[in-house]
Amino acid sequence: KNNIHYAELLEEAGCQILYGFVDYKVHSKICTVTKKHKGTIKQYTQIGTGNYNEKTARLYVDYCYLTSNQEIGDDATEFFKNLALANLQGHYNKFLVAPTSLRSGIMNLIDKEIAKAKNNQPAEILMKMNSFTDRRIIDKIAKASKAGVTVKMIIRGICCIIPGLKDKTDNIEIHGIVGRYLEHSRVYAFGVDEDRVLYISSADMMTRNTAKRVEIACPIEDKAIKARILE
């Protein structure tokens, strides 16, 4: 009722409302603002791991990334265009988007770390999420562990992989954080040092997120911001 009520209020105010996709919940958290400044068009994009909710914002730990990066802005524009067209098959240069490219993108990044480990190169995977239940990604993480990849995970809720099993998950370390605020951010990092690739996302590695929702994982390429997230 609340959603319908506010949608009607916004439409009455002249806003165009996009109602999303049939059978898929839009769970991504993204906002893009375009403005004309001194004769040029500037675009600002905000991508977060948490909801636009003033109550949970006081209780949850999340990340909010605000950028004028044009490639991110182009992907944001493409995302909203596809949302308006109810098109799930969009092409993105930076984003990994569920239900089409998020799971496969994460699995490809895991495969790259497996290849490094097999070539006796440093290989590491860091994941922080609320819950971990996607069977295909679980199997891939177990494969990474067996290959010698160091896997470190911070998981707040459901976790369907057992760390420390001999010859299976020896290289997986899992922790939970209990503090004043609820840990809600999702972070996925692959590699070490300067070669590390890092994404923030609205999605947990759960089948409902990777296959049944519209989600975004956005790369963080600024060195200072990456370092701050990894602290």
Explain the meaning of each model-derived region.
Residues 69-90, 104-105:
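Short, compositionally biased "basic patch" segments
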Residues 58-61:
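Acidic/polar active-site rim loop that often engages polyanionic ligands
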